Amino acid sequence: MAITHNTHVDTSDTFTPPTFSLQEQRALLRTLRQQMVAHYRPIIFQGAGPIRVMARMVAELEQQCREHAICEEVIQSEIVNRTIGDVNLRRVTECEGIPGGAGDYRMLADELGVALPGEQLHGYVTTGETYLWLRDQMQECERALLQQRIDVRIYDIFGIGNPILRGWLAGDMQRWGLPVIGEQVYLGLGAMDSADKVLRSMSFFLREQNAANPGILFPSPGFNVPEWQARSYGYHLHHFHTDARHTFKLTALQLDEVLRQAPDIRLFYLTVTNNPTTFAYTAGELNALYKVLRSYWEAGRDIYILADLAYIGTAQPEEDLARMKTFAAPDVLRHTIFVSSFSKSHTLTGERFGYVTIGDARLAPTLLPGWTNSTASLPGEWQLRYMAYYRLVQSRPWLVEKLRALYRLRRTRLAAQLQKINQEQPLFERIHPGDDATVYNWCQLRPGEDAFSLFEKTGIAGVPGSGFGYTDDYIRFSIGVIPVPEVE
């Protein structure tokens, strides 16, 4: 693995005049950008993670620009970091309609309790009311827990979180049509931690059954962190390369073929709404996959679904409901473990609110070691804040719709921006529309182009397809951090 955090591009021979025009600053920045691309391109081939390489390249270029006294206006117009799939409400500038109205997205940081009282956010001064309200709710929640003799300040023996919050989250799953109870819900520090605990527990459980390392199926492109986790726990990794003809989704015929060819597969990582492609399985497509799996279940081969729900809640509600209801079939639910998170659906990436729902109540106790032997006990303040945020969203459901509207606005604007760029200098083979979900845009580049050449020519940094187990003629752009201007 290449170490990139100490890399530095030597630009000492690039002369910076004491004072120089905006045009000269842009020319200098583009020269620096070209040098940075030449330096970082080989690092990808040395095995470093593409997402981190691209993000590091952008950060170092910004640093170099400031060292050369290039003004912020030029930096922001010539360097657009769309690599990391984060969401930063403090940087939201979009306002549709009248200030303070339903389309004033600048208010989201205040409305979701991210902003402190008195922050100046792009012409809007925050009240901090929700910020303070959340702290009052934390106190109320702690009192409610203590009344039931639950003290989050001491060890939770199983490390799965307090039963009141777990019951609330089970209620959310019930609203999707899934008959689960709080005992089937375990808390985790975000989706990644939750997936890690499941993979650790399932590896032990499956090896105890067969005395062999189990196989796991990962369709690509897809989020690759669970792959690293699975590899570390001894799984045999099986990949299937999906294609644009099927909107990058695994078909029933393809699933059947893979399962027949790899009899060791016992776990299937299914991203219901996909990162990076932004396409989501329809209810019909999911049922077709279950039909294939059912034939194996009935033959005595248990294959479990690890269903990643990280982006459920970012699409149209009625479509998400239809998707989730398909899991209610008793045999499907019994073979499914769900991983959920508030990170993208509620823009709370830094809070790390995640949880696991185990469809089979009999399997749930078997997975306890993944929690008990890792975190030992979940943080008390974190649990209280988790509960406060749950109450916030339940009491103000319009917040989630407003977030969906912001995501939709940005995805639409970015697609229009990329189309305009493509008219001026053909770089994209196709700009995929997606399924009106996630915080990304997914594009195919023209032959001869890649993420580095695109950055050199446009200043827009994305993540190459290899970051998702795919080919580098594809690229993912994030819309969660940097606002997207309207195309004129």
What are these regions (language model features)?
Residues M1-P18, L22, P163, G167, ...:
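PLP-dependent enzyme catalytic core of the Aspartate aminotransferase-like
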Residues N6-T31, Q35, R41-G190:
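N-terminal small-domain helix-loop-helix segment of the aminotransferase-like
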Residues S21-M36, E73, A109-E111, W133-L145, ...:
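Conserved core segment of the aminotransferase class I/II
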Residues A109-D302, I312-D331, I337, P483:
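Conserved core of the PLP fold type I
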Residues L306:
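Generic enzyme active-site microenvironment
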